[in-house]
Amino acid sequence: MNTGLDLEVSFNHLLQDMGLSSTISHLLWLPLPMLLVLTAALIGVLVTVWLERKISAAAQQRIGPEYAGALGILQPMADGLKLLVKEDIIPDKADNLLFTLGPVLVLIPVILSWLIIPFGQNLLISNVGIGIFLWIALSSIQPIGLLMSGYASNNKYSLLGGLRAAAQSISYEIPLALAVLAIVMMSNSLSTIDIVNQQNTLGFLSWNIWRQPVGFLIFWICALAECERLPFDLPEAEEELVAGYQTEYAGMKFALFYLGSYINLVLSSLLVSVLYLGGWGFPIPVELIANTLHQSINSPVIQIITASLGIVMTVFKTYLLVFLAILLRWTTPRVRIDQLLDLGWKFLLPISLVNLLFTAALKLVFPFAFGG
């Protein structure tokens, strides 16, 4: 189902109607995608931080933030401003270049990964044919930044935290990639748009979660580990490592780690929504909505309605998963480092391999149901 809304085409037509040439309109469009990504990511982080604070307060029978704006909604902005004006301290014996570069290498790949996230048929920044592969490639850069930050701090706690972060990320990237590969195999495409379209034929019955329940669980567990969320927050375990690789960081550099962690959480939830929960798709087929309203499926009214509802559905599914991740953080104990690595290498990796082989077999036997 095509929403008929293409951001770039609509923007260029608008500027050309105002008298600007096509060349100028294309040049003005170039910086907009990244601005849209940054805006969406920052808004997503602000909402997620506020949710985390209120849910954690409820779990601990507290009130939580309530003075900064209505219901404390402006508290994340107050925290950000506080970190922004704090002094930027670099330890005397730290490696200045690596110490500064580490947080940047952690944040930039996460932000760039938002380029492939679709909120509708044409409502995404970059519709590249290898979107999933691009995301996996970008996510593999983050452990380098974490290890670099821990090493450059010249602190034993920071180094241990960086080593843990790198080991954890590498251990869980492989089963995560294998779980995604099963989805790619069924969709016959690496494009996030194609993966969502393949799930929108029969409403919620065609969502990949029903055909890949094991893959869904593997992906979700690995995503939480990649985000370093409890019960997998070993790299920054306060009782053992003070703050892990973040120990020597303050001010804006610390804020970059904080920002990257929450952007990664929202991104992971978006990817689960896209890969397993139909993305912008509705629980019922779009054709039923068009028939109920007595409109053609290609009419402008239906196009606008489906595009708007598609954004709402994507955000709703995403924050449902964010809510689940926050609940898990405040209700589960931290695992040990040996348990963490055993889970990744001895359980999730073999299970993800078996799941991939089983998916390939089902695709051969039941091609109509598994994308043959």
From Swiss-Prot:
It comes from the Bacteria. Keywords: Membrane, NAD, NADP, Plastoquinone, Quinone, Thylakoid, Translocase, Transmembrane, Transmembrane helix. One of its GO terms (molecular function) is NADH dehydrogenase activity. Pfam families: NADHdh. It is found in: Cellular thylakoid membrane. It catalyses: a plastoquinone + NADH + (n+1) H(+)(in) = a plastoquinol + NAD(+) + n H(+)(out); a plastoquinone + NADPH + (n+1) H(+)(in) = a plastoquinol + NADP(+) + n H(+)(out). GO terms for cellular component: plasma membrane-derived thylakoid membrane. One of its GO terms (biological process) is photosynthesis, light reaction. Its EC number is 7.1.1.-. It is a multi-pass membrane protein. NDH-1 shuttles electrons from an unknown electron donor, via FMN and iron-sulfur (Fe-S) centers, to quinones in the respiratory and/or the photosynthetic chain. The immediate electron acceptor for the enzyme in this species is believed to be plastoquinone. Couples the redox reaction to proton translocation, and thus conserves the redox energy in a proton gradient. NDH-1 is composed of at least 11 different subunits. HAMAP family: NDH1_NuoH (MF_01350). Belongs to the complex I subunit 1 family. This is NAD(P)H-quinone oxidoreductase subunit 1. It comes from Prochlorococcus marinus (strain SARG / CCMP1375 / SS120). The lineage of its organism: Bacteria, Bacillati, Cyanobacteriota, Cyanophyceae, Synechococcales. The gene is ndhA.
